[in-house]
Regions:
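Recognizes extended acidic, P/S/T-rich segments that occur
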Residues: 427-460, 479-480
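Pro/Thr/Ser/Gly-rich low-complexity, intrinsically disordered linker/stalk tracts
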Residues: 394-423, 461, 476-493
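Ser/Thr- and Asn-enriched, surface-exposed coil loops between beta-strands
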Residues: 406-413, 448-453, 505
Length: 505
């Protein structure tokens, strides 16, 4: 049972974390911006929340929470984190289910569930732009290549989705080509029968990246890091071909496992930080155990260190930005782990969404999404609702104002004003598609403070280029600039153009 739901009322307006409390919630260095009860976001008293992901509209810079629920997926505009707005929901494809998982690619969300026959729903998020009242939406596309699935991961750099825990592929990787989001198509099944409780290669969760770590044999290849119930599984998925023998396996990490649940890579691809969901519940460890794997040699992953948290709560999902790990620990809430000293990690902040207790039980928070440019974090409370929180010291910056000119044929010079220090830089993204989403695939360059301009050269003067810029401070990315459209051709008497935010007169 979930004892806190009836005790929490909806909250608008910021409640600061002062002396270890934000209202009734225990906290440290994280403020509460708002809370929406599950009945406000498309649920009933019997509905439960599960996974969460986010989307930032590349045209408007608005931020949205995509909230997994037992009865479907809800969409909430959190652009004003102190006054979130419920926009509507996409109902479950078949039946209700405790388990739902979702990720975003090219302005579409891809949704799977353990509901029987559910398949993968695809929804075009740009439909959220002009909603004036809560709406019940329909699929944009649908993939029926599997029924139920436990989780989904999307490699945005390659355009492949990885559904795991399905009734196909031994429960391993069911790979779907989503390079055209509205036309998903099966690519391959990959598993390793040396992993998983039933010897079929069942993967509970996975993260796949274009590898850029220290193991030179695999740089530039698509490498997957699976949490396969009994092992950490590392596999070369650069070639998408069928394999159920384990032939694609590079390395296996073995340890005193109870349930290898989920993990996330550090940004330098040197470490894989894993949660084991059942070790606390099995009374194997008194407090929450987080395993930090050294994966510098992909063929030989080894545990670098083990972190034991301050409570006995169960750990669930980890996500990483810079030297911080954002962890959902069921009854003890969102925990932030500082890994700047990887051999001796320390907790730097927390926000407990479940005030009743910190027991070893499956109550409290399921997951969190820390990747909004504004720096706010969306957190699900399983039986409570949606929390939006904000780490102290995170000041929601303004989008930069950028000027540009074409100094010579085939080149564009971008310029800006920047106030900062040695931790500040301007990140520049470029694409040839209008309305693009900034990310690693279209990242162009960074200019460290005090630099205030950048020239992009060797361009095709016959086409348009699109640019977005964002200020990064202490590893935290601020809002993106208005999209700049320019053709690098010199026009007679051409004057620089200034892009001014719409609210500036």
């Amino acid at each position: 049972s979930f004892s806190t739901a009836s005790q929490i009322v909806s909250i608008r307006d910021k409640i600061e974390c002062v002396n270890g409390l934000a209202g009734q919630f225990e906290c440290n260095e994280i403020d509460l911006m708002s809370f929406m009860d599950k009945t406000e976001i498309g649920g009933s008293n019997s509905t439960s929340l599960n996974d969460i992901w986010g989307w930032t509209d590349p045209q408007t810079n608005k931020e949205y929470a995509l909230v997994g629920m037992s009865n479907g997926t809800s969409f909430v505009d959190i652009s004003n984190p102190e006054n979130p707005i419920y926009l509507g929901r996409l109902p479950t494809q078949t039946n209700n289910s405790t388990w739902r998982d979702l990720k975003v690619y090219q302005n579409h969300v891809f949704i799977v569930s353990e509901a029987s026959g559910h398949g993968m729903q695809v929804f075009d998020l740009t439909q959220l732009r002009n909603i004036s009242s809560p709406t019940t939406f329909s699929n944009t596309a649908y993939y029926s290549g599997f029924g139920n699935a436990h989780n989904i991961f999307i490699n945005e750099d390659t355009g492949f989705a990885y559904a795991v825990g399905t009734s196909t592929c031994g429960g391993g990787l069911h790979i779907v080509d989503i390079s055209t989001p509205s036309i998903p198509s099966k690519s391959a099944c990959v598993s390793d029968p040396n992993t998983g409780r039933n010897g079929t290669g069942y993967s509970h969760d996975v993260q796949c990246v274009v590898y850029n770590g220290p193991d030179s044999d695999y740089v530039g290849k698509e490498i997957c890091f699976g949490s396969n119930e009994t092992n950490v599984w590392i596999a070369d998925l650069n070639t998408k071909s069928e394999d159920s023998s384990g032939a694609k396996t590079i390395g296996l990490g073995s340890y005193d496992n109870y349930y290898t649940h989920q993990g996330w890579l550090t940004e330098d691809h040197k470490y894989f930080i894993v949660n084991d969901e059942l070790d606390e519940n099995s009374n194997a460890y008194n407090n929450t155990r987080t395993l930090i794997w050294n994966v510098e040699d992909l063929s030989n992953p080894v545990i670098e260190t083990t972190y034991l948290g301050p409570t006995p709560s169960i750990d669930h999902n980890n996500y990483i930005i810079g030297d911080k790990v954002y962890m959902s620990h069921y009854t003890s809430g969102l925990r932030v782990l500082d890994i700047s000293n990887i051999s001796s990690p320390t907790e730097s902040a927390f926000f407990d969404v479940y005030p009743s207790n910190n027991n070893t039980s499956f109550d409290g928070t399921w997951s969190n999404y820390p990747y909004y440019p504004s720096g706010v974090i969306a957190v699900t409370g399983i039986d409570e609702g949606l929390f939006v929180v904000n780490p102290k010291g995170n000041v929601q910056g303004e989008a930069p104002t950028v000027t540009y000119e074409v100094p010579t044929e085939g080149s564009v010079t971008l310029a800006w004003e920047l106030i900062g220090d040695s931790t500040t830089r301007m990140n520049i993204y470029r694409d040839i598609e209008e309305g693009f989403s900034p990310g690693s695939s279209n990242f162009l360059a960074s200019v460290d403070y005090p630099g205030i301009e950048f020239t992009d050269s060797n361009l095709d003067s016959s086409i348009f280029y699109y640019y977005k810029l964002a200020i990064e401070t202490n590893g935290q990315l601020g809002p993106y600039s208005t999209e700049i459209k320019v053709k690098p051709i010199v026009a007679p008497n051409q004057a620089p153009t200034i892009d001014v935010p719409a609210d500036v007169e």
